[in-house]
Amino acid sequence: MDIIFYHPTFDTQWWIEALHKAIPQARVRAWKSGDNESADYALVWHPPVEMLAGRDLKAVFALGAGVDSILSKLQAHPEMLKPSVPLFRLEDTGMGEQMQEYAVSQVLHWFRRFDDYRIQQNSSHWQPLPEYHREDFTIGILGAGVLGSKVAQSLQTWRFPLRCWSRTRKSWPGVQSFAGREELSAFLSQCRVLINLLPNTPETVGIINQQLLEKLPDGAYLLNLARGVHVVEDDLLAALDSGKVKGAMLDVFNREPLPPESPLWQHPRVTITPHVAAITRPAEAVDYISRTIAQLEKGERVCGQVDRARGY
């Protein structure tokens, strides 16, 4: 069994050694331009077209939860990967836990009004504020995939009213499910906190725009953990300036790194992190990949395969 590996920033030698330990029968090599030797599996992130084109691979593993970069490259270069080759993404591998930590910490930050107290502190103003009540602090999750379900589970511990919206209806205990565009307005109408965990598809690009934000309750909060292209940043800034949206926590942006001149940096109601909400944990990723390859070799059914038509 031959495995080729390509990632522009990961420690390639660490991955090769870890994969050797996890799959002793495999020959693992770092792919370099000009390498046209045969391979059974490819582990990639932002791969060059020539790495995958023309290969009779058993499967390709994207080394992250998102596959929009490889799918967009496939649209431009359909010869890059045969339609018969399954594409897998890292469904969790520790990312769910990281998303839980991020979401819970920020929801509690807003619920306890720490954002308001920070603004008061900046002006040396001492003033206790009325508390928020859980029953009025409904949390809505846009996107009901693996990571969305993990975030919902973690927030249930805090007894917030929860709802989710997705393409198809879900049956999550304790979570009110909304499905399809026809139910989006009803979903948004009660969301005091909107958490975005949607996949990046042509249908979801720019979905968080003026029209969507206007359907939220006054003084709502936005937490974007998915992709920057989901948010029309000018519309969000306008909603923040008007008070329609009281605060935003943003981990992803249309341009990354976020340009220094972006008004988001200095906005008093915006908190920024540099795309770190959930990163690939190498040891857990190697464990997932090795188990999945073992299942594929046995002809077993596996999880995590990307539906190229849907984009996730």
Curated annotation (Swiss-Prot):
InterPro entries: D-isomer_DH_CS, D-isomer_DH_NAD-bd, GhrA_Enterobacterales, NAD(P)-bd_dom_sf
EC identifiers of the protein: 1.1.1.79, 1.1.1.81
Residues of the active site: R227, H275
Compartment(s) where it occurs, according to its Swiss-Prot or TrEMBL record: Cytoplasm
Keywords on record: Cytoplasm, NAD, NADP, Oxidoreductase
Coiled-coil annotated residue ranges, if any: none
GO cellular component: cytosol
One Gene Ontology molecular-function label: NAD binding
Record field: catalytic activity: glycolate + NADP(+) = glyoxylate + NADPH + H(+); (R)-glycerate + NAD(+) = 3-hydroxypyruvate + NADH + H(+); (R)-glycerate + NADP(+) = 3-hydroxypyruvate + NADPH + H(+)
Pfam families in alphabetical order: 2-Hacid_dh_C
Function: Catalyzes the NADPH-dependent reduction of glyoxylate and hydroxypyruvate into glycolate and glycerate, respectively.
Protein family per UniProt: Belongs to the D-isomer specific 2-hydroxyacid dehydrogenase family. GhrA subfamily.
Name the UniProt record assigns to this protein: Glyoxylate/hydroxypyruvate reductase A
Native organism: Escherichia coli O127:H6 (strain E2348/69 / EPEC)
Source species taxonomy: Bacteria, Pseudomonadati, Pseudomonadota, Gammaproteobacteria, Enterobacterales
UniProt gene name: ghrA
